[in-house]
């Protein structure tokens, strides 16, 4: 049995690792969105034509390694890095004094292999656009959970004293609109040209009509965010909540600008990749805004 002094020492050492590992989880999953986008935008979605193996012969590409195989295999390899980070995060929280973070660290750790399984199903279904859509949304959810983990680490007291009011209701509406934007965006992608492979099926929906719907939902999202900024200022809410809402609005405007430019320039891959990064940033920013608003009211 460890002495109290030894136990406190171990807790302190573990505490030092919790925050960096939380950031590693967040940034690693953002990178996974970017590399997953690279897989799709370069037509490398079936660079490893099966799952969980890369080919029928093994887990790594065999024979002449082409660019598509290298990109897809690199994306899969990143998942193993995220698994290691997730396990390290669970161990750190279990050994730290922050017992309130343990359950969330386990959820994050389970989310990584779940997301990988969904990716495997996407490969086994020849990049079915609905499965690919869900695959991306899983990453967005993990990014949001990583932000929640970091926020709770920073605000251990506030996390247990959350109240609700009209401004929080507006923040929830903004959060819901953000997720509607993300979902419709994946459906738009499923109808467009960047399928991940030349033979991959599309969802058969009209990309022009879907793009219009996506734009309409974005305008709703921006309007709600503007309303939230004004409501937070009018109610003299905590500076952290006002700052979070302003950052969210700035991210939305930048993301919307990229979206409009890519639409009118025939979806160049660089802009589509930036738009994917923007989507990951939206998920992080809207989660942060909701948490700060709930804590400030």
Q: Where on the chain are the PLM-derived regions?
A:
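Polytopic transmembrane helical bundles with strong interfacial aromatic enrichment
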Residues: 1-297
């Amino acid at each position: 049995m460890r002495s109290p002094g030894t136990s406190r020492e171990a807790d302190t050492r573990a505490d030092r690792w919790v925050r960096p590992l939380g950031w590693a989880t967040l940034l690693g999953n953002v990178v996974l969105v970017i590399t997953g986008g690279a897989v799709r935008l370069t037509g490398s979605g079936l660079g490893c034509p099966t799952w969980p193996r890369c080919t029928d012969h093994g887990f790594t590409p065999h024979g002449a390694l082409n660019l598509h195989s290298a990109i897809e295999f690199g994306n899969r390899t990143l998942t193993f890095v995220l698994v290691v980070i997730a396990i390290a995060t669970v161990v750190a929280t279990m050994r730290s004094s922050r017992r309130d973070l343990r359950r969330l660290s386990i959820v994050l750790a389970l989310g990584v292999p779940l997301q990988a399984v969904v990716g495997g199903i996407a490969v086994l279904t020849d990049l079915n656009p609905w499965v690919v859509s869900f695959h991306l949304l899983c990453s967005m959810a993990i990014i949001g959970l990583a932000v929640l983990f970091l926020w709770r680490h920073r605000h251990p007291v506030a996390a247990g004293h959350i109240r609700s009011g009209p401004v929080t209701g507006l923040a929830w509406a903004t959060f819901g609109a953000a997720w509607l934007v993300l979902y419709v965006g994946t459906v738009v992608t499923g109808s467009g040209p960047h399928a991940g492979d030349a033979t991959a099926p599309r969802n058969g929906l009209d990309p022009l009509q879907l793009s219009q719907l996506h734009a309409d939902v974005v305008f709703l999202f921006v309007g709600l965010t503007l309303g939230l900024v004004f409501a937070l200022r009018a109610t003299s809410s905590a500076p952290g909540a006002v700052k979070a809402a302003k950052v969210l609005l700035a991210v939305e405007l930048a993301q919307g600008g990229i979206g409009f430019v890519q639409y009118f320039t025939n979806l160049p891959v660089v802009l589509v990749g930036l738009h994917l990064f923007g989507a990951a940033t939206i998920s992080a920013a809207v989660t942060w805004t909701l948490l700060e608003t709930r804590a400030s009211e």
